[in-house]
Amino acid sequence: MEDTFICRIATLTDMERKWEYEIARHSDDPGNWIVWKKGALANRSEGRTLPYYGLLNGEIICEATAFIKPDPDEDAEGLIDETTAYLCAFRTNPPYRGKGYFSKLFAYMIEDLRTRGYERVTVGVEPEEVVNKQIYAHYGFTEFVKTDTETYPDGTVINVEYYAKKI
């Protein structure tokens, strides 16, 4: 039997399933993940995000989220506007990494955003995440936008560099 991989915009039911998986996977310290789940569901319900999921034989194996409207509590200058979407939550379940599934999901997401009128996408990365920076550069994120900080629900503050690419 041949494997079936599909990409789609997640339903709230899909999101519940995926977030429960992430919380269980981070069971040693689920606090941030529980707060992020609540925010992700609210952002989707309020039309601020488009969550994209890749499913292999019905199992959610990878994801990415596009913020298409800024959160009123966040500084989205240069990151989100009428023609710019902010991409985040790039995750692939460990057994499926390096097999091209996320690349297919990414291409699907970019094409969907393009058809919705978006012309530019942005990403954020911590300066010390060298491998992620290389991956983003490979995907074309080479235009430096700005540096800022992000505060996690537990109070941890991280530095973030933001990059953009035209689509």
Task: Specify the residue positions occupied by each region the protein language model found.
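Conserved N-terminal entry element of GNAT/NAT acetyltransferase domains
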Residues: 1-17, 21, 167
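Acetyl-CoA-dependent GNAT
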Residues: 12-13, 23-89, 93-94, 106-108, ...
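Active-site acidic-Proline motif in GNAT/NAT acetyltransferases
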Residues: 93-95, 99, 128
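Glycine-rich acyl-CoA binding loop
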Residues: 98-106
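Conserved active-site alpha-helix within GNAT-family acetyltransferase domains
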Residues: 103, 128-145
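Conserved GNAT acetyl-CoA-binding A-motif
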Residues: 113-125
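Conserved beta-strand-loop-alpha-helix junction that forms the acyl-donor binding cleft
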Residues: 123-133, 150-154
